[in-house]
Amino acid sequence: MLNLTEAGQSRYRIVMPREADGKNRFAAQELASYILKITGAALPVVTDELPASEQEICVGPVSRDGLPDTSQLKNDGFIMASREDRIFLVGHNSRSNLYAAYSFLEDVLGCRFFTQSVEHIPQRETLRVEPFNLVKQSPFEYRETSWHGMTLPGFDPKRGFNGAHPHAPDQGEGLEDVFRYLGFGHTMFDYVNPDEYFDEHPEYFSMVEGRRIKDHTQLCLTNPEVLEITKKKLRQNIIDHPECKVFSLSQMDWYNYCECPECARVDAEEGAHSGTLIRFVNACAESIAGEFPDVLIDTFAYQYTRQAPKKTRPAPNVSVRICSIECCFTHPLAECHRAMFPFIFATTPGVTFQQDLADWSRIASHLVVWDYTTNFRFYLAPMVNLHVLQDNIRFFRDNNVTGLFEQGNGQSVSGEFGELRGYLLSKLMWEPDGDVEKWTQEFLAGYYGNAAGPIHAYIKLLAGHVTRYDLHAGIYESPKAFLHNALIPKMDALWDEAEALADNEEILERVQRSRLQVRFIKFHRKGPGDDDYDAVCEQLISDIRRHGVTYIQEGKDIEKSFDEMRHGTLPGTSRSDYRW
């Protein structure tokens, strides 16, 4: 047994390397800060220049006997181990030392970091722990989400993400061990823009139905001048942005791929429209590989390029991001082959995401999934996917996916379960086989207090509903078409109970904000002809404002959304707009 503190006093000190960088120093300071909060004991933070003592918590690669070997770790892996009375928290890179400190606080000392403002810090003046030897390593080298609150400065490392979000200054300025992109997607026009080139060089852009088009075009990827312009600008971008690890060369966010004879020939030879794309991106990537060996060139397997080419493999320094945008998200991705509205009209019959992922897995050295975890047309509508998150992340791992971007509502605080979903995603990116039910219960208890029980029952009610009726939903689903009217009284009863059980005003605010999802469903079933429509609408708008929700539809100014609510013109008001 290790006696870390006794009655608020401790013989331990925290040791870091003499030449520790900002993140390593910050890890040691955070550890001291939280141990003080837990026990009241102030542990000194020193460097390994001092002679060793028996009772030390060593953070980072300190010069001490017993230091674990991390040379075989990858993907920000780290080791937490006790050696007699000494504790080691050490990762295979600088950032993973910080992960080790936070994991020790969570897994050994019992802290929980639910959101940036909601934590559980146990109170123990006397703190004893059993000997331990733990190794943690994510199966994914890149882990990122856009859920609001998960990426706030200083919080994302507590959740183990490593996308290049804003970082608190005291975590260190170096971003060499995070995935920082230059251009995150739809970037081809950053290199060859039709506004600059089309008038003099229409041949640089897509031929569609026999003519070159400027509006909503793509690049002609077999044009040698387009390739040379792109290679030159790519090299300059890498020189100008040494802080970036990944440089995007990805199609624009629409169709209209080039049908010129040469592009058509290559795509036919490759059996997929990704043929021209991968050959083009490979040529760009190979042009910079010798000079910039640590740089990755990112591209998409998205919509018309989602199918893998039959002949050409992505170069070793090319990262392919396959996007699941067409899929159903109420069933495990491994099991459901249905394409959802509106993509059902543009999806090739017989072509499935599952097969495309497997095909890319066989040929790509770096395979990232861009996955979708919210309803982008209705941020306030329930996204009934909590029960499939683990299945999906296991599916990605089992298909040799090397990175995950789990896109959510990144524009506003959630009126649904954004905080819970972001928390679960962060845990699953490190432990796909972990205990999701335990994590869910811990989060609900920490975030909603005594109201956790009925809220948990509500989550299970929705999951059971979609399973019982085999309901499918994509990322633009209408809540009117998706959830049955008979469910609403049961929903309301559970949220009434949750509000009645709320511990205090702060908890009540969280409960009422999360209840907006049910109120939105009920409102969406009304029409301007209903007697109480105006009153219900204005009260809902007032409460949306009061709870700090600033977007309820992706990319649309909330005042425009409110006007649509008032006039009964929200998208999906007519069930004919949706297929399910």
Role assignments for model-derived ranges:
Residues 262-274, 334-347:
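Glycine-rich tight-turn/loop motif centered on a GG-T
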Residues 7-11, 15, 19-22, 26-30, ...:
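Feature activates predominantly on carbohydrate-active enzymes
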Residues 298-332, 380-388, 413-422:
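Substrate-binding cleft/loops of secretory-pathway carbohydrate-active enzymes
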Residues 37-50, 295:
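Short, well-structured beta-strand/strand-turn elements
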Residues 225-228, 236, 341-451, 457:
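Structured mid-domain segments that build the active-site/substrate or prosthetic-cofactor binding neighborhood
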Residues 371, 425-580:
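Catalytic domains of carbohydrate-active enzymes that cleave complex glycans
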Residues 44-71:
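Short, well-ordered secondary-structure micro-motifs within conserved domains or adaptor modules
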Residues 267-287, 314-334, 396, 424-434:
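Acidic, His- and aromatic-enriched active-site or binding-groove loops in soluble protein domains
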